Each structure stands twice: as C-alpha cells, then as structure tokens.
C-alpha cells in the first residue's frame, strides 16, 4: 500500500515523506524504497554524524530527493512540493520529543499536510485510541486492511503461567516450554525473536539485612547491574559504580541482586555477541547463536543495520531485545516469538499503560510467520487471564478499543480532554514544590475569571522520577480543552508567575499531549 501511494505521488510530480518510529526500521524501509524508486532518496535521523546530516539536508533542500525517510526529526525536512506524509507505526511514543525543542510529530505532520495540501497517512495495526476515535468520529478517513500481507494466517498464541513454573521448581527466567520450543526451532533451522523490555543483567541490588536499595545519587531510581562491565549503571544519567558493591553502605549487610534484563536472559540462552562466550545455559541451547539488541548493544554507529543484516543472513538463530525488536521487522525464517517480563509494563504508571502493552504484544507477535512457515508465540506472565493480554493474543484491536474508550470516557482522559503536564525543575525540593503550588494557585485564580474555559488542576505531585540529574521534579496535571483560549490562559499565568518574587524559582516545562509525566 505504501509503495502504491508513493508511486502515485511521484507520478503527480510531488514528493513523499516516510516517518518511522525507530532508527532500526530505516534500513529495511530504505532498501524497499530504493529497489522500487531508485536512489533519489534521503535519510534523516539522529545516528547520522553532522557531515552526513548536512549532506542529506542539502540534497533535500536542492530538490535532489523525491523521498525522505527518517525518524521524528525528519518531519521538518525541507521537501518542496510535498504530496504525501506516511507515519508508520503511528502509535509509538517515540514520535514525541522529550527534550527541547519539544514537539509531537503527529501535530507537525498534520500542520504540514494542511499547509502543503498533502495527504497524511497514519498507519498502524494498533492505532492510538485518539486516532481511531477521530476516524470513528469522521475527522479522519478510516481505511482497513482485512488480510495479513501475503495472506498468511496470524501466529498462534499460548500463555505460560510463570507461577506454575516457579512452583514446579524452575527458577530461570526462561520457561521449560519456551526453552523446548527454542530448541525445536534450532533443530529445524528456523529463527526466533525474544522480547524483554529491560536492559542490563539484574535490575535491582538490595541489602538482605536492612532492605536498603542501591540507588543513583543523582536520580531517584535503582541502579542496574551490568555484568560485562561488572558495574552498576544508571540508565538515566549514566552514573556508574565500579567495582560492584557486595556490602550495604547503610548497615554492612550483604547485597543481593535480583530481577532480570536482556543481559541475564542472553546468558541463560547461550552466548554473547561474537568474541565473547557465555556458558550459563549451554545445556539448554547448545550451539545457539544469539544476538542481543538493546540500547547497550546498539550504541555504535550503524549497529542497528549491521545486526539486523546479520540476523537476516541467518548468522544468528535468536534475536533477543527490548521493544526495538517488536516493530516492523520482517524476517522470513522467524517462526517463534517469545515475550518475557511483560507484567512490569502491564502494571506500569500512566493512563496509556494498557494501550502500550496491547500494542507491544500485538506488534511483536506479528513478527512471526511472515513467509511460508507458520508462526507461533509464547507469552510468559503471572496473569495469563488478564483481559488486555487475552485481547492482544487474539489480535482483537476493536475489542481492546471498546474497553479502552469506555475507560477513557468514564475517567475523562484523551480523547475526551487534552492532557497537559506543567513540570517544575530545580535544585531544592522544597522550593520546587512551592513553585508548583504557587503556579497552580495562579492558574486557578486566572481560570476563575474565565468560567467558559473547562479546566481541572491536579497536583502538585512528584513526577514518577522525582530527582533526575540532581534536579528535583514536580508537576501539575491539567485536564483541559487545548484551544486558543486555554493557551492564552497559560500565557497569562506564566507571565504572572514570572512576576512573582519567590525566593527560589523553578524552571517550568509545558508538555502537551502528555501521558501524565515528563
């Protein structure tokens, strides 16, 4: 469908912009487009160095590119005569920038489409609830593909109850059945994908005597054990503790490391990347060639493209990774998908938690059985009867949407209101809290003079990560109608806050289309 739309756009003498949520998806997309449309194609994403980015930008600016492919920043590419914008996997949160300049690629794409009279396509098997609601309401045109590409059946999905595994004496993170089916795939010369959305080896270090948890001194989060470095690492600020602590800094008791991440599961499966062998589970999968793909293993330039090409050439049997392995990848020999550790996401914070889990499972399950061989998926969980997991296993998006839209309507969440977070960041926790409190009071006072503006002010409250990079963080959550009148109200309040003579102020950050945190 994408190729036909792009072909028609080029025939009309116009140009096309294709957005993808992850850098890892650009190589496959580029190969497909170049094989069909030739080399007049430019790329925009953060993995390019400054020289490469400038050359690609000039190529676009000078009119030498008919198609641009890239991640969210590509939405600003200076394409002239733009006729088509495709946002693939539009449900992904990576389309929203979390650092300055803050923007949502959805909003920028909509604005460009209107300004340039271009067609905008939001593509997804699991659209955002707001997007599908807009289509149901007639604000967007809904086009549904009722058959899987190539006419292949959907993979079969089974659940593995990890409570039963533990009761049966299996302490491993990989269940007996998953290990058995991985071995069957190895014997049959087929490939497997395993999803585990946690990096590192062990996810928490805790004292067995007093219960003290080893946390980052700069951020209010536990440090994560990374075995190759024999160190604890903060995934937010990069703080490192080396050598690995064995005794509690509070009471001198023994530190125990628990939980599991991709490094731990990789060790349980067989070998590390080429040149480093892991023996922990050689008895389970002797001879297995395992490729780990997460933020740690893909930090090198071109690592995504190199690793995916290696997997496509069947240099590896198992692709193990975080959520980057769930999206848009297409390997004909992948017949088994395993999902591990999904419960931590299922019970995560934010009103989009269920939506994220449903999308993630649906996407990763769809990576299997995409060619001649049928696919199957195994989901490890302690709550196999959870309705979100059951709906995801059945690939029942409409069923999930009905449940989700009912919850959103009852609880007044988007699309039935706009969700805006006003963040406050500073050096002194007390001062940050007072700043948030004062801003909320000012906003309430100004809003009281404009009763026609619907507004609910929640907070102040600490953010999910209260301290980040030695800065304390609090928030106000606003349920509102994000129109010109509301934005004018915010500007008035910001001006009034700026005029206040508080002893210590905090930086203020506005985050529109938020899921409830920064």
Question: Predicted regions: what is each one?
Answer:
Residues 1-433, 445, 463-466, 475-476, ...:
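Inter-lobe coupling/hinge segments of SF2-like helicase ATPases
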Residues 36, 446, 450, 497-500:
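Solvent-exposed amphipathic alpha-helical surface segments
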Residues 291, 446-463, 504-513:
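Short beta-strand elements
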Residues 398, 433-458:
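Short amphipathic alpha-helix segments
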Residues 435-441, 488-496:
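Short amphipathic alpha-helices in soluble, non-transmembrane regions
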Residues 469-471:
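C-terminal effector/interaction modules appended to NTPase cores
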Residues 477-481, 513:
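Short, loop-centered acidic/histidine patches that primarily coordinate divalent metals
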Residues 491, 495-518:
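Generic C-terminus detector
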């Amino acid at each position: 469908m994408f190729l036909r739309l792009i072909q028609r756009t080029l025939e009309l003498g116009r140009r096309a912009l294709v957005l993808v949520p992850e850098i890892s998806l650009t190589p496959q997309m580029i190969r497909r487009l170049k094989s069909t449309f030739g080399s007049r194609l430019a790329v925009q994403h953060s993995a390019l160095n400054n020289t490469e980015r400038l050359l690609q930008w000039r190529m676009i600016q000078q009119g030498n590119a008919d198609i641009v492919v890239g991640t969210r920043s590509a939405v600003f590419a200076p394409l002239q005569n733009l006729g088509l914008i495709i946002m693939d996997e539009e449900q992904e949160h990576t389309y929203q920038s979390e650092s300055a300049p803050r923007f949502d690629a959805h909003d920028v794409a909509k604005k460009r489409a209107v300004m340039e009279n271009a067609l905008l396509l939001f593509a997804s098997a699991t659209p955002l609830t707001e997007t599908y609601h807009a289509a149901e309401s007639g604000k967007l045109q809904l086009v549904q593909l009722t058959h899987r590409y190539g006419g292949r059946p959907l993979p079969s999905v089974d659940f593995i109850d990890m409570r039963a595994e533990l009761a049966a004496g299996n302490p491993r993170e990989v269940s007996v059945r998953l290990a058995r089916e991985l071995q069957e795939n190895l014997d049959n010369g087929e490939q497997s994908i395993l999803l585990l959305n946690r990096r590192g080896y062990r996810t928490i270090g805790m004292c067995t005597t007093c219960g003290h948890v080893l946390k980052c001194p700069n951020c209010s989060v536990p440090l994560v054990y990374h075995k190759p470095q024999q160190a604890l690492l903060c995934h937010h600020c990069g703080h490192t503790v080396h050598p690995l602590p064995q005794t509690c800094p509070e009471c001198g008791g023994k530190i125990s490391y628990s939980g599991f991440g991709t490094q731990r599961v990789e060790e349980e499966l067989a070998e590390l990347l080429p040149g480093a062998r892991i023996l922990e589970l050689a008895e389970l999968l002797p001879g297995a060639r395992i490729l780990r793909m997460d933020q740690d293993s893909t930090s090198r330039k071109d690592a995504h493209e190199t690793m995916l090409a290696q997997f496509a050439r069947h240099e590896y049997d198992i692709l193990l990774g975080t959520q980057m392995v769930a999206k848009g990848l297409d390997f004909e020999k992948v017949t088994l998908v395993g999902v591990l550790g999904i419960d931590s996401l299922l019970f995560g914070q934010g009103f989009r938690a269920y939506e994220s889990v449903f999308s993630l499972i649906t996407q990763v399950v769809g990576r299997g059985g995409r060619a001649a061989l049928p696919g199957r998926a195994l989901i490890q969980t302690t709550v196999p009867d959870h309705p979100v997991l059951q709906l995801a296993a059945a690939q029942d998006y409409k069923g999930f949407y009905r449940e989700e839209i009912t919850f959103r309507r009852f609880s007044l969440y988007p699309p039935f209101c706009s969700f805006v977070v006003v963040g406050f960041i500073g050096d002194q926790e007390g001062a940050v809290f007072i700043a948030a409190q004062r801003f909320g009071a000012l906003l309430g006072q100004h809003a009281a003079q404009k009763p026609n503006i619907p507004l609910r002010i929640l907070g102040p409250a600490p953010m999910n990560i209260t301290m980040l990079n030695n800065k304390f963080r609090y928030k106000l959550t606003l349920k509102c109608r994000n129109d010109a009148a509301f934005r004018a109200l915010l500007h008035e309040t910001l001006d009034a806050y700026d005029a206040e003579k508080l002893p210590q102020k905090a930086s203020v950050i506005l985050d529109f289309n938020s899921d409830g945190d920064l």
